[in-house]
């Protein structure tokens, strides 16, 4: 069935650079068609220095929202009217929701992870959590676990480009959720004996 776009069609997008390889437009547009939703999803190649303009255009065109990918996640967070609790701690976003001109930035990786655990009968409240890695998704998972009541989070990461960020994330969580014990360890310092 051919997609008909009208003056009532809601617009959603992906912003970042590069985005030409993204499968998101095909995935979302297929889903909208199957669900009978009057939306269209496109990808805009937006370099970091144009994020402010892109977000202003989002309001101007009354776009319902967008996904944000690298390298725009930190820059986009600066122009939100509101940030979710996890996005406040991390200082980056991957989703923008436009609610009548009010833009709220979210970081959804951790929310999705914790929601999936709950769907499988696992409640993290009061639990000890171990996370391997300190990249973007791992950071979001650590933060969301702390926000959702994990008692202790231990992060293991090799001393690479993400390690300093791993230590910073641990400190941010300690400040935002002081009841959660946060530990970060350099994997290169851990020796396993046989």
Placement of each model-derived feature along the sequence:
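Glycine-rich adenosine-cofactor-binding loop
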Residues: 16, 107, 126-146, 157
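Short, flexible coil/linker segments at domain boundaries that flank nucleotide/cofactor-interacting
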Residues: 7, 123-124, 148
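Residues at the starts of beta-strands that form the adenosine-phosphate
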Residues: 11, 128, 151-152
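NAD(P)-binding Rossmann-fold cofactor-contacting core
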Residues: 150-173
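Phosphate/diphosphate ligand-binding glycine-rich loop within oxidoreductases
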Residues: 4-120
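Conserved small/polar residues in nucleotide/adenosyl-binding loops
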Residues: 190-194
